[in-house]
Structures are given as C-alpha cells and as structure tokens.
Amino acid sequence: MSNTRIERDSMGELRVPEAALYGAQTQRAVDNFPISHQRMPAQFIRALILAKAAAAQANVELKQISAAQGEAIVEAAQILLTGDFMEHFPVDIFQTGSG
C-alpha cells in the first residue's frame, strides 16, 4: 500500500490509507471480512449520522456530555452530511462488528 500511515490499537500496528478518516479497527474489518464487497448504502450511513447527532443533542440536555462535546458531534455530523465522505465508510455490509 503506498501513501499509508501507521495506526495503533490494542492488536498492534497497521497501515491504513493516508487520507482515510478511520483507523486500525476499520482497516482490520476491511482486511479480514471481504464478504460481499458491497458497502453499506449511503442512505443508511446518513440515517446513522442523523441518529448520532440527535443522540448528542439529547445527551447534552440530559447533562451526560458537555455542550462543547455535543456541539462538536453535531458539527461533525453536519460536515459528513454535506460532503462526499462515503469512501470513508468502507466496511462490508455483512460485517457485523465481529472484527
């Protein structure tokens, strides 16, 4: 792999694409579970992003996270929703968290 960076997690070091917005665990899932070579549909990913933003707002109201944390999550969600970031969600649709 050219143009990579080294990421570290509890399982050790791993090379991931330099521009990737994900880390070692996602790369391990991609490498270890090439089941269907189909990615999660963009509509599902967008719905999940909206759910994460809503959860952040609720958790701010419930004082489970700070306002700054909630704002950061909502801002990140808005960036993901308005840009073209689907390449950064590479895990196979049938990989179910076992990686």
Description of each model-found segment:
Residues 1-98:
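Conserved, well-structured ligand/cofactor-binding cores
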